[in-house]
Amino acid sequence: MLNQKIQNPNPDELMIEIDLCYELDPYELKLDEMIEAEPEPEMIEGLPASDALTPADRYLELFEHVQSAKIFPDSKTFPDCAPKMDPLDILIRYRKVRRHRDFDLRQFVENHFWLPEVYSSEYVSNPENSLKEHIDQLWPVLTREPQDHIPWSSLLALPQSYIVPGGRFSETYYWDSYFTMLGLAESGREDLLKCMADNFAWMIENYGHIPNGNRTYYLSRSQPPVFALMVELFEEDGVRGARRYLDHLKMEYAFWMDGAESLIPNQAYRHVVRMPDGSLLNRYWDDRDTPRDESWLEDVETAKHSGRPPNEVYRDLRAGAASGWDYSSRWLRDAGRLASIRTTQFIPIDLNAFLFKLESAIANISALKGDKETETLFRQKANARRDAVNRYLWDDENGIYRDYDWRREQLALFSAAAIVPLYVGMASHEQADRLGDAVRNRLLTPGGILATEYETGEQWDKPNGWAPLQWMAIQGFKMYGDDHLGDEIAHSWLQTVNLFYQQHHKLIEKYHIAGGTPREGGGGEYPLQDGFGWTNGVVRRLISLYGEP
């Protein structure tokens, strides 16, 4: 698809006094109606049994003690530890000694668990290297080899090598990997592309979907569904033929559409919402409604300040993580307050564009295999989704795509997610032209395009720019003939990354691009991470198209 033109269109301990009271939104379903509208999901088909327990499930009160005591600066550290013995024995020992006067929780953890390996300190960048050389030399540093599953570890073993983003992220991530893959072929690493293709197909076969990442605590959710884009990339770069992945694409589609057939208008189940007119659109979802293992304390604190039932807040926080945009004003009712998060009440433009791509890919590959019936069915599904998106998510007055608040039945915020319909070929030429004007006027800066127009302190908001958004905007506008805007974003982003690299000799997760010299992007629940997989991948691909800045 690259550069192609589109031709056709203990609870008491957790309580604090707050000055907020929970007022039921008149557009929200009341609790008794909520139970009917959002029935409890069944266990995900294919989910492995005991060895897929999350650390919170496995260590119970020990887990909560460790996380609430903050013995590690990062909430993700303990979930990533591996036990040195049977977890049940550890839990029994903990229950025997925890009330001793001289009990040391940190020492107990260090005696009974292997702490996560730290890889970043092993690599020192050569300041003489060009940006391209730096990226090419980083791939081995970010590569993890297949390993036997450490008993009771949260890490899910994969059959082949894979790339991790870097920093605190020592596992592979679903949608990150697509943007990382963009650069692997340019660096001559088709071997890694093949490995990652096999890994994602394997996860679909074994779990029925691609999890957020290869950790047990990520199994209850996915991320933006980009496997169809990966398949397209594999074929373009001569890695694998698309036909071999048709069954995997269908399995992923079934995961995202689970329960759709039984819904009546204005009902939702898992990822699916049936709209008032009967059409189907999708939202982000997580099958759990507990604090995230990897951000347990942060989630508990957020829920305490919400004034809402904690399980609702936890579900929305988890769904926000599934979106990849964790977190953003896109999911907040009060843009300055994370506790107002309502992710499951929004129908996101990017998610539905990615699913349009998935439906189209299934139709196209079915046609290649001579399966006319499946081709016709999925072509109809894709067209129906596009019609529903145009009906509910297209703001004709302002010429932009926006998320849709299905509980309040109104359009939500404008963000850079609006460019995804262009990237997947779902927009008309008129929509692309009008969206281009809006992006120029509202999101474009000398350093690239902003995630949103709103400065909230969340990392997926102004003033931050992110590599995947730049790539989809560049390619999306160029595919619709707006080479000028696409090239401007490309040169601006390359300049941003290169200026920062010349000063600091590293690439990072996100950049502050709202004026002045590019610097580290802020916000989020964890310190800025360097490495960084998808920045490397996008920049390496752009260097091949535009040359080094």
Swiss-Prot record:
It is found in: Cytoplasm. Substrate binds at R168, W175, D176, N212, R221, S222, Q223, R292, D293, E294, G324, E525. The active site is at D326 (proton donor/acceptor), E509 (proton donor/acceptor). GO terms for biological process: cellular hyperosmotic response; trehalose catabolic process. GO terms for molecular function: alpha,alpha-trehalase activity. Its main location: cytoplasm. Pfam families: Trehalase. It catalyses: alpha,alpha-trehalose + H2O = alpha-D-glucose + beta-D-glucose. It is an enzyme of class 3 (hydrolase). PANTHER family: CYTOPLASMIC TREHALASE, TREHALASE. Monomer. This is Cytoplasmic trehalase. Keywords: Cytoplasm, Glycosidase, Hydrolase. Signal peptide: none annotated. Belongs to the glycosyl hydrolase 37 family. Its EC number is 3.2.1.28. InterPro entries: 6-hairpin_glycosidase_sf (IPR008928), 6hp_glycosidase-like_sf (IPR012341), Cyt_trehalase (IPR023715), Glyco_hydro_37 (IPR001661), Glyco_hydro_37_CS (IPR018232).
